[in-house]
Curated annotation (Swiss-Prot):
Domain IGFBP N-terminal: 35-112
A biological-process GO annotation: negative regulation of BMP signaling pathway
Glycosylation, residue list: N71, N113, N330, N474, N746
Record's protein name: Cysteine-rich motor neuron 1 protein
Modified residues (Phosphothreonine): T1035
Side Cytoplasmic, residues: 961-1036
Motif (Cell attachment site): 314-316
Organism annotation: Homo sapiens
Amino acid sequence: MYLVAGDRGLAGCGHLLVSLLGLLLLLARSGTRALVCLPCDESKCEEPRNCPGSIVQGVCGCCYTCASQRNESCGGTFGIYGTCDRGLRCVIRPPLNGDSLTEYEAGVCEDENWTDDQLLGFKPCNENLIAGCNIINGKCECNTIRTCSNPFEFPSQDMCLSALKRIEEEKPDCSKARCEVQFSPRCPEDSVLIEGYAPPGECCPLPSRCVCNPAGCLRKVCQPGNLNILVSKASGKPGECCDLYECKPVFGVDCRTVECPPVQQTACPPDSYETQVRLTADGCCTLPTRCECLSGLCGFPVCEVGSTPRIVSRGDGTPGKCCDVFECVNDTKPACVFNNVEYYDGDMFRMDNCRFCRCQGGVAICFTAQCGEINCERYYVPEGECCPVCEDPVYPFNNPAGCYANGLILAHGDRWREDDCTFCQCVNGERHCVATVCGQTCTNPVKVPGECCPVCEEPTIITVDPPACGELSNCTLTGKDCINGFKRDHNGCRTCQCINTEELCSERKQGCTLNCPFGFLTDAQNCEICECRPRPKKCRPIICDKYCPLGLLKNKHGCDICRCKKCPELSCSKICPLGFQQDSHGCLICKCREASASAGPPILSGTCLTVDGHHHKNEESWHDGCRECYCLNGREMCALITCPVPACGNPTIHPGQCCPSCADDFVVQKPELSTPSICHAPGGEYFVEGETWNIDSCTQCTCHSGRVLCETEVCPPLLCQNPSRTQDSCCPQCTDQPFRPSLSRNNSVPNYCKNDEGDIFLAAESWKPDVCTSCICIDSVISCFSESCPSVSCERPVLRKGQCCPYCIEDTIPKKVVCHFSGKAYADEERWDLDSCTHCYCLQGQTLCSTVSCPPLPCVEPINVEGSCCPMCPEMYVPEPTNIPIEKTNHRGEVDLEVPLWPTPSENDIVHLPRDMGHLQVDYRDNRLHPSEDSSLDSIASVVVPIIICLSIIIAFLFINQKKQWIPLLCWYRTPTKPSSLNNQLVSVDCKKGTRVQVDSSQRMLRIAEPDARFSGFYSMQKQNHLQADNFYQTV
């Protein structure tokens, strides 16, 4: 029994020992799967050196190690054998005996052979140790970090300290600055907070912002048999800074459980081939194949004699259209017909002065000549030419000798063409020649025989994506150091090198064909330009004792004469089609003459705060992503862009876009800049560098670097659904009852709102999150209203910065036209005189002139009066009133000052008549004659003499005006106290009709007479500014 009992006890102990041994083995096995990591101490980490690729974190996520390269080991438990570099994958092959994969096998790094859709533009990032410094809170903070891109502004501490010293010297006075309170946003895990700081030269800090932190992007560590697959690409915005990966199994999947999608058989065209079959990531299914063009297939056909190849369709390099398709046709060339003249294939002909055509396959392909910019005050377009040329100022005709050119003798003022590009003018016996200025807007201009300026056979508007130029880092040069600008690389980006004078001037004379015996003229930068220097003047020394502050006058040869200048020399580079304005002394000033200038808003000064919330210094230029902008005296001036009007009722401007679009409209509308010119305003006017004007009552524009930049009024938020804009308002207004907020008295509700970006708004505060939306904070809830855009009738509506809806600028700008006559430009409705007999008028671009015809005179010996067109009889001539002393020389050669007998009367002046008119003394007051109180005339003389004089005057006028209407004497009885006159000529009024005034001239001019309520039977003279007022169409 005991034995049995003892056997049973031993058996129980044996079972217990076996159980304990199995538990220990299980713990031992499980211990091999555990990963024990000590607390991270980066000071004990060794920096990996000479890594052939990038670096990755170790298994414990503390220290860095070199990433495994192609054909190196990887995988294992927790990736203990290594992690493959970017662009490689860890491939673990199944065992040869058919067993399933475990997590202990080691893999090999191989290339990733995924499709483009699976990779999503996956690119490796080579992280390196980068050292540098940044200015933070007025101090230089330096550090050394491992990153992909350089986050430092200065590469060394010395450069940072020198920049900090320069900033301290230019630091503004911030004692009175008022800065807005900036709230710091809460950043996602993949980004870091950049605290707002005050830029150099500014007092207020910029808002704090979140920026992506590449070091915070971690890739998942997948178990063996799985691979990191890129699912979505990072967008660069906080919250989307990192690429998103998922772990997917690799070749360890049982394909029997995988259902593959059907793959259609690809049939490729004859000009292409089918690519090889590829497998999916799990190795179970095949991917669709695609067609690619065959290499070396395209060629030029060889046609038989008598036929030539002609292209049928152009190839674009895609399967089915890999090559151009030709056909052989007969040699009979189709012709182009223009003005009943046939032109064959390849022939060029001229449609008008500026358009040339080439006949191609029976179709006329026309192009426009390319004219360049001219920098002169006076210019003209030669007859039969397109591009203007500069013209010398008009000199008085002093030399009767002409110019000898091309075997002909030409007179003063004559112009002729020397060659294709040179035009000359005869000025006082000397030939002055200038060259045509040509422009170039295409890469391959074509020279037309017999023409100066080339033409572009490709479209004249070339759309080129601007190069993505980064900031000019590690460069201590400033704009003051490089007065001629910075050099640019092949991508058009600035480099840290200045343009010297030789490089700047080399382009000024490029293509110049003038042969100038006395050299070339120079511009403001002392660079030679394509214009000849005139013959040097040989002047004799003069002796002049006059003191002339403004210098002496010059004769036609450019030599000084002993006469003083009354006006200073005009040094101005502006191009003014209407000429320059004059000051009170009649001297020209550097300001263009305008027909009418509307008063604009006052010009501010200082820095600009843009609509986007950025600060810019005065005269600073920048590009806001959509348009070119410029800071002018505190105003943000931006170029107008052309945008289509959205069709929906609640448009918005999406991030990264420039034009308003609808929510479901995914087509990015690229804005077009308004047609660039040499500051050619939308209204048709020309402006020069630095000039400002108003295109309407709401928009002020300026000319900067050859582009029209405009600023507009910033509009407040609109708290209604359907705002509208009237012609007399600059901003849209709420036509219906606007939303009026009422403050809540519920203390349990917070008195602020918070949007999705973390911005905080107070109760009843309104704002515009974008230019098309207005919001308001009520009871901690944000309510928003969208603006809808009305339809427009123009082809190219423009969009001002800061506004939502495009509009037609043609509706607000009156079209102004200019008349060109004798080399001068005149504004619309402007008048001028060619001489005393010919008067001209500009009407809508047409020049209309009228000539006065002189009537026969009853006298035998008429006289010519200076300033008058027609001669007149001596008894009709009455000298005009004057009180200017006249110089007369007596018989001894002395100069006497003599005042005329008819002084200009002023108030309370007494006029003494000559002796031959009797002893009549009158007092001139209130513009009327009054008998003097101390007159000694007797009663008979005071009555008879005036009657005789009046009857003589009346008989003389009735005889002269016998063809005119008789003047009823009763009409003169109602003449007002102020006499009516026109151009110092006698005015006769028809009292019965009251609407026509006849001037004593052979060409009678019609005037409109309107009743004046102050005087009974009197009509005031109202000058009308149109052709019917001056009778340019007919004479009576």
